Amino acid sequence: MFNYNTRWAITEYMEIYRAAWKWNRSLPKDARKFRILNISYHYNWQKFSGVRTPENMHEVFPLGNTEDFRCGLLEREVLASGQKILVLTGTPHAFTFYHFPYYDYTSPGYVRYEQNFLGNLLYSKYGSKVVAIALHQPFPNRLNRQPALLSPALGRLEAIMGRMDNKPIGFDLKGTPLGKLDDDSYYSMGYNDFTLADLFDGYIFLKPISGLSSCSIDYKFMDTKNVDTAENVHLFYKSLSYYLSQVPAYDCLLYTSPSPRD
């Protein structure tokens, strides 16, 4: 878990490692093994001065920004040899053809569109070979609007799923009626006639948002034996007592910011 800038010990992450290890041990000696690829690296937050500047960010991220690094790693480890990979990442990092909007005074219409997230970089090189599939989730609302989170497609997607008894299902968005559902979330800022198909290629509905829960946190992962290692890896590990005080708050946390970084 310390091979990335992991802030918290997520039980499900460790269960994935355990399942892959168990599966690989069951295979014949020469069989191709199930592989888990860590697409990031240790950041050096000890070099952070409290204010983000080009100079200290070069120190914090010595191998480059996360998007470029991840793109290069996937190319070297997977795409260069013609293999395929399923990448699980935060939603903005997964955008491919869609360009995430920011308010920007100097841009036309006061909106600047990000084209350098991981998915964007891969899509610019490999086109339709790279697809973005969303897991059902709340969308961030427009700036200065409440509530902070919205049900996708103005709630119509969940209404349709409700008529189907909320059974888990995956479906295409491109060229389908569900993909034509209008959306007025933050993602639509700067776009005209914005629909779900303008965001992703496909969608996986697991259950209504009201029934979703966050990952499980291993409260015993951090102890006096490894807290020093954690402090060196991540800025937010200030002490064992601080970590333990923050876990309950994080356990209830929902994504509310439309512009995550790092």
Show where each model-derived region lies.
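Conserved small/polar residues in nucleotide/adenosyl-binding loops
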Residues: 255-262
